[in-house]
A protein has these predicted regions:
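N-terminal capping/small domains of soluble enzymes
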Residues: 1-97, 102-104
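C-terminal helical cap(s) of enzyme catalytic domains, especially alpha/beta-barrels
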Residues: 55-64, 200-214, 256, 268-293
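Short secondary-structure boundary segments
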Residues: 45-47, 129, 193-194, 267-268
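Alpha/beta enzyme core
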Residues: 104-241, 247-262
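Surface-exposed amphipathic alpha-helices with a cationic face
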Residues: 6-7, 11, 82-93, 117, ...
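Short glycine-centered, acidic/aromatic-flanked micro-motifs in structured strand/loop junctions
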Residues: 21, 101, 129, 167, ...
Length: 305
């Protein structure tokens, strides 16, 4: 009998399948389709201090092998998430959940994380450092090791629960960013976030997205995710959550061999709302097909092959 359980920052997961933030909402809508308790956990939609209405339309564009999005962190704000979204989730999900946090200043990250840290349902805080730093010329925190470390250090000092830093792939060396976050106290890292891209409407002769650029997700970016998980695994000793183009159980196994402790789908949930349930269902057979008895034994296994 195969063993699919893994441990993430001291919390045991039944399996390593973790739907990525942004495409799984706050979970309860998917619970109308299937029992979401089958998942290892999931990361809910990015939360900011204030309500955000998001970017102008159109926000979504098709792309070869995936899609572009520029939703713009639309969410009701942290107080509404705690008062309205988490109680609804508690009725249908009976495991610790990952709270994804976005901010435009270190102070905002700290305030939002501190509030979510006090919520019983929240098991981990996932800090999305792909946001622009309004006090740093607008560059994303995640593009500079010092800025990434500053956010990580400030959040760690303010909370008790494990801090996972979500890394941007739009950098010269993701390993350097990961190492800076680890040195600043991060308990884990998650990667990759979407890859910056653009599509242009040939008839209108202007960008398809109102925001001009957007984040590319879907199967086309999966090899990038594998490469970056590999590089980060060689740079740090903290756990890695792998994501980016995951659509099937074999993809999760591949990310784990590259160094991830867990992995999950993002855009796949928009194509097939049952995608992550199907990955959980198919995982034991995929393990048998590749002679894998215990998932904990294969983490980073390709580095020793």
């Amino acid at each position: 009998m195969v063993r699919a359980a893994v441990s993430l920052c001291g919390i045991e997961l039944d399996n390593p399948v973790i739907p990525a933030s942004g495409t799984f909402g706050h979970g309860y809508t998917f619970a109308e389709l299937y029992d979401i308790d089958c998942l290892g956990t999931f990361s809910f939609k990015g939360t900011t201090r204030e309500q955000r209405l998001g970017n102008a339309q159109p926000r979504i564009a098709e792309a070869p092998g995936g899609m572009l999005n520029a939703v713009g962190l639309q969410n009701p704000g942290v107080d509404a998430v705690i008062a309205e979204e988490l109680p609804r989730l508690k009725q249908v999900f009976h495991k610790p959940v990952m709270a994804n946090v976005s901010g435009f200043s270190i102070e905002e990250y700290v305030e939002v994380c501190r509030k979510l840290d006090a919520c019983e349902q929240v098991g981990w805080l996932e800090v999305n450092i792909s946001c622009p730093n309004v006090h740093g010329g607008g560059l994303a925190f995640g593009t500079d090791p010092k800025a990434a470390a500053s956010v990580t250090r400030a959040v760690k000092a303010a909370v008790k629960k494990p801090v996972i830093v979500k890394l941007s792939p739009n950098v010269t060396s993701i390993a350097d960013i990961a190492r800076a976050c680890e040195d600043a106290g991060a308990d884990a890292v998650s990667l990759i976030n979407t890859v910056l891209g653009m599509r242009i409407d040939l008839r209108a002769k202007r960008p398809l997205l109102a925001n001009k650029t957007g984040g590319m997700s879907g199967p086309a970016i999966f090899p990038l995710a594998v490469r970056m998980v590999w590089q980060v695994y060689e740079a740090v000793r903290i756990p890695i959550i792998g994501m980016g183009g995951v659509t099937r159980a074999e993809d999760v196994l591949e990310l784990m061999l590259a160094g991830a402790t867990a992995g999950g789908g993002g855009a796949a949930n928009l194509v097939n709302p049952y995608a992550c349930r199907d990955i959980v269902r198919d995982l034991p057979q995929a393990m048998q097909n590749y002679n894998i008895q215990n998932l904990k034994d294969i983490i980073g296994g390709a580095h020793h092959g």
